[in-house]
């Protein structure tokens, strides 16, 4: 149960961190943490990594 709670709060923190990295136009800047399933990187960038990664130039 404690492991689940830790995972839950880690996920919550990650979501909050993600939203602070998003610029006004709604895209993630270079080297921002991103999810490969929900790629919101700015133009000419792609989320590189396995499941989670960083926005890098294409």
UniProtKB/Swiss-Prot annotation:
Main location: secreted
GO CC terms, sorted: extracellular region
Tissue-level expression: Abundantly expressed by teratocytes, which are extra-embryonic cells released by parasitoid wasps into their hosts during larval eclosion.
Keywords for this protein: Disulfide bond, Secreted, Signal
Disulfide cysteine pairs (residue numbers): 27-42, 34-47, 41-55
Signal peptide bounds: 1-24
Cellular compartment(s): Secreted
Domain of life where this protein originates: Eukaryota
Domain-related comment: The presence of a 'disulfide through disulfide knot' structurally defines this protein as a knottin.
Additional remarks: Negative results: does not influence host total hemocyte count. Does not influence hemocyte spread index in the host. Has no effect on humoral immune system, since it does not influence the activities of prophenoloxidase and phenoloxidase in the hemolymph of larval Diatraea saccharalis.
Record function comment: This endoparasitoid wasp peptide has immununosuppressive and insecticidal activities. Suppress cellular immunity which is detectable as a reduction of hemocyte encapsulation in the host. In vivo, ingestion of this peptide (probably at excessive doses) increases larval mortality and reduces leaf consumption in both lepidopteran species D.saccharalis and S.frugiperda, which are permissive and non-permissive hosts for C.flavipes, respectively.
The protein's name: Teratocyte protein CftICK-III
């Amino acid at each position: 149960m404690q492991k689940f709670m830790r995972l839950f709060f880690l996920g919550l923190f990650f979501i909050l961190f993600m939203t602070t990295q998003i610029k006004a136009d709604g895209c993630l800047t270079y080297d921002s943490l991103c999810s490969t399933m929900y790629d919101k990187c700015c133009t000419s960038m792609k989320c590189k990594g396995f499941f989670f990664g960083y926005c890098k130039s294409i």
